[in-house]
């Protein structure tokens, strides 16, 4: 189950959204919103209020002359005062 969550995305926009209890992750592209919500609630013992997903389109890399595969990004809204702790 942990291998379905790939890593947390840390950009300027995602760091600013941490103040409003929104976390951004890259997840496996086969997961749907209900599965993502269940995984995060079980792994981190938090209440997920909202799940927003976004699939990035595959893009052409001019350096390697091939397409990069698409990925799925998820933005989770959790209860205020709760934190996702990474060990």
UniProtKB/Swiss-Prot annotation:
The keyword DNA damage does not apply. It is found in: Plastid, Chloroplast. InterPro entries: Nucleotide-bd_a/b_plait_sf, Ribosomal_uL23-like, Ribosomal_uL23/eL15/eS24_sf. GO terms for biological process: translation. It holds the Pfam family Ribosomal_L23. One of its GO terms (cellular component) is chloroplast. Keywords: Chloroplast, Plastid, Ribonucleoprotein, Ribosomal protein, RNA-binding, rRNA-binding. It comes from the Eukaryota. Belongs to the universal ribosomal protein uL23 family. Part of the 50S ribosomal subunit. Binds to 23S rRNA. This is Large ribosomal subunit protein uL23c. It comes from Bigelowiella natans (Pedinomonas minutissima). The lineage of its organism: Eukaryota, Sar, Rhizaria, Cercozoa, Chlorarachniophyceae. The gene is rpl23.
């Amino acid at each position: 189950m942990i291998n379905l969550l790939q890593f947390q995305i840390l950009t300027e926009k995602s760091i600013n959204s941490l103040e409003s209890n929104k976390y951004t992750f890259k997840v496996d592209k086969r997961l749907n919103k209900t599965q993502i919500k269940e995984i995060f609630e079980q792994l981190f013992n938090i209440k997920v209020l909202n799940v927003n997903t976004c699939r990035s389109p595959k893009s052409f890399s001019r350096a390697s002359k091939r397409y990069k595969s698409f990925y799925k990004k998820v933005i989770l809204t959790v209860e205020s005062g709760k934190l996702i702790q990474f060990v």
